[in-house]
């Protein structure tokens, strides 16, 4: 490892500069890494802690290549879906190193690629699904899958463009929202049948130089396609946990590379279904900032740098609750911090996002408790204490 801002520096470039990337940037800088952050807008969270930043349309392959060739990073770390991933494949072929790999990024940032890999190549259990690229194909897919179902753009995250279709009256609206709400604009959708599950988990799965390490399962509650709260550890029976690890291992081993993967799974009794996977820290994993001795961000930093990842120690029942205001402002301010942090074992992260347009995740409350329910209650109370001023 060299010295930041010197000729011998080890440089990491982040494609995307959100709150998850911000935490990884901080962890990398603990190891003396020089970090460059890029995104489509200025002053994004990770930009605020990086050594330097660039505003780039990451869906433009020419613009993306230009900034990468200018910076010549040792590692390229994609943080969001809206990236010209075929260009990353070309850059990797030219000698750049993409985390965890350009193939993994290309597959996982497109729901069609990863679902076909999991269900059709690896033979893993999933919900029933169809893909559609036109309105006519969509209507046919809805008829084949049957109601109720979920419609998602193949390129989106955090619930953007996602709808639940329970009645025929919802069908047309879901198609239109998928075409306008996805991060990459109009395009193909996945029509996904409901799975009758007891709960859903994120299994953080780390692929590093010494093998694969699993964190304790994270339970979470979704609303409108985005997570509202998460907790760790999620209680599971032994067989369900074993099957979850087998599914996660199969996916992560196939995708390869080093780093942390957030593997999303549905669980009912002893049965487990694969849902999705992200090749980077997961938003539900924000809870690991208090629940583990090494957060998912610290683990990711170690793994991508080729540093061994030891057994991760759990700190006890922990929870996170999202701060999710709705409004419009370019000068957001917050009150209620003293009240939010009054309880022992409670922490807060305000992400520093430069503007609020509509509904946006602006922070998260974190709590340790005597039980999962105690931790969840403390986190929810802390989150609700924060008042967002527009």
Swiss-Prot record:
Q: Name one GO cellular component term.
A: cytosol
Which controlled-vocabulary keywords does the entry list? ATP-binding, Ligase, Magnesium, Metal-binding, Nucleotide-binding, Purine biosynthesis
Q: Where does N(1)-(5-phospho-beta-D-ribosyl)glycinamide bind?
A: 19-20, 79, 283, 353, 360-361
EC numbers on record: 6.3.1.21
Give all residue intervals belonging to the ATP-grasp domain: 116-305
Pfam families given in the database record: ATP-grasp, PurT_C, RS_preATP-grasp-like
- Quick one: which residues bind Mg(2+)? 264, 276
**MF terms (GO), sorted A to Z:** ATP binding; magnesium ion binding; phosphoribosylglycinamide formyltransferase 2 activity; phosphoribosylglycinamide formyltransferase activity
Binding-site list for ATP? 111, 152, 157-162, 192-195, 200
Pathway participation? Purine metabolism; IMP biosynthesis via de novo pathway; N(2)-formyl-N(1)-(5-phospho-D-ribosyl)glycinamide from N(1)-(5-phospho-D-ribosyl)glycinamide (formate route): step 1/1
Reaction(s) catalyzed by this protein?
Answer: N(1)-(5-phospho-beta-D-ribosyl)glycinamide + formate + ATP = N(2)-formyl-N(1)-(5-phospho-beta-D-ribosyl)glycinamide + ADP + phosphate + H(+)
PROSITE patterns, alphabetically?
Answer: ATP_GRASP
A single GO BP: 'de novo' IMP biosynthetic process
Question: What binding partners and quaternary form does the record give?
Answer: Homodimer.
Task: State its role.
Answer: Involved in the de novo purine biosynthesis. Catalyzes the transfer of formate to 5-phospho-ribosyl-glycinamide (GAR), producing 5-phospho-ribosyl-N-formylglycinamide (FGAR). Formate is provided by PurU via hydrolysis of 10-formyl-tetrahydrofolate.
Which family, according to UniProt?
Belongs to the PurK/PurT family.
NCBIfam families reported for this sequence: PRK09288.1 (NF006766), purT (TIGR01142)
User: Under what name is this protein listed?
Assistant: Formate-dependent phosphoribosylglycinamide formyltransferase
Originating organism: Marinobacter nauticus (strain ATCC 700491 / DSM 11845 / VT8)
């Amino acid at each position: 490892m060299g010295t930041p801002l010197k000729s011998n520096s080890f440089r990491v470039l982040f494609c995307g500069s959100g709150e998850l990337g911000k935490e990884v940037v901080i962890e990398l800088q603990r190891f003396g890494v020089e970090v460059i952050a890029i995104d489509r807008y200025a002053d994004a969270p990770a930009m605020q802690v990086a050594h330097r930043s660039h505003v780039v349309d990451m869906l433009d392959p020419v613009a993306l290549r230009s900034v990468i060739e200018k910076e010549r990073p040792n590692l390229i770390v994609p943080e969001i879906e809206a990236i010209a991933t075929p260009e990353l494949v070309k850059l990797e072929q030219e000698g750049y190193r993409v985390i965890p790999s350009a193939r993994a990024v290309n597959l996982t940032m497109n729901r069609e690629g990863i679902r076909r890999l999991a269900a059709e190549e690896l033979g893993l259990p999933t919900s029933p699904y169809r893909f559609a690229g036109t309105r006519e194909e969509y209507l046919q897919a809805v008829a084949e899958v049957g109601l109720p179902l979920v419609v998602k753009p193949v390129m989106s995250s955090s619930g953007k463009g996602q709808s639940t279709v329970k009645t025929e009256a919802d069908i047309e609206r879901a198609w239109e929202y998928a075409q306008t709400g996805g991060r990459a604009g109009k395009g193909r959708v996945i029509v996904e049948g409901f799975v009758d599950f007891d709960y859903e988990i994120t299994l953080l799965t780390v692929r590093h130089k010494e093998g694969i390490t699993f964190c304790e399962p994270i339970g979470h509650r979704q609303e409108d396609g985005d997570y509202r709260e998460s907790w760790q550890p999620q209680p599971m029976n032994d067989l369900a946990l074993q099957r979850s690890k087998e599914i996660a291992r199969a996916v992560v081993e196939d995708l390869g590379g080093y780093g942390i993967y957030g593997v999303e799974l549905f669980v009912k009794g002893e049965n487990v279904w694969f849902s999705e996977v992200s090749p980077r820290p997961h938003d539900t994993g924000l809870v690991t900032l208090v629940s583990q001795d090494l957060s998912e961000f610290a683990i990711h930093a170690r793994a991508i740098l080729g540093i061994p990842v030891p057994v991760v120690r759990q700190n006890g029942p922990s929870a996170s609750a999202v701060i999710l205001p709705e409004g419009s402002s370019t000068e957001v301010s917050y009150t209620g911090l003293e009240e939010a942090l009054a309880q022992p074992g409670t922490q807060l992260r305000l992400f520093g996002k430069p503007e609020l347009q509509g509904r946006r995740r602006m922070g998260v409350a974190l709590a340790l408790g005597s039980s999962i329910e105690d931790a969840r209650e403390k986190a929810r109370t802390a989150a609700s204490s924060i008042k967002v001023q527009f």
